[in-house]
């Protein structure tokens, strides 16, 4: 009976490990391409484990669609110069992303050009990275 319980726990632990690995997989992202578009911020989710940026863009057919961009968590973004209010709904921005392979609107965030021309990425420089206030 002890062996059965131990075996069950081991199987459950392995299942959780596979799920965690899949969560951090970039298999659905086309790492060979970047797209740059302009759009209007619909929502900015400043949250763990990932922040999200939702942007309304005009597609090539002239229809609007919402792009969902996965970003790093706030701790990384702060080191890259972000604040929780760096972008707000209604802001017109230009963004670069690595798109989904399946063609759905969205992907992995690379950077954004704000209305004032400031460019924000999602990773701080490796050496001498400054610490920024969050408010």
Regions found by a protein language model. Name each.
Residues 71-79:
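Short, structured beta-strand/loop micro-motifs enriched in basic residues and often containing a Trp
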Residues 7-19:
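Bacterial N-terminal signal peptides
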Residues 118-135:
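Extended, charge-rich, solvent-exposed interface segments
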Residues 79-94:
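Short nucleic-acid-contacting surface segments enriched for D/E, G, S/T with interspersed K/R
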Residues 47-57:
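Short aromatic-glycine-enriched beta-strand elements
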Residues 37-41:
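Conserved hydrophobic positions within beta-strands
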Residues 20-35:
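Short boundary/loop segments of OB/S1/cold-shock single-stranded nucleic-acid-binding domains
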Residues 100-123:
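OB-fold/S1-family single-stranded nucleic acid-binding modules
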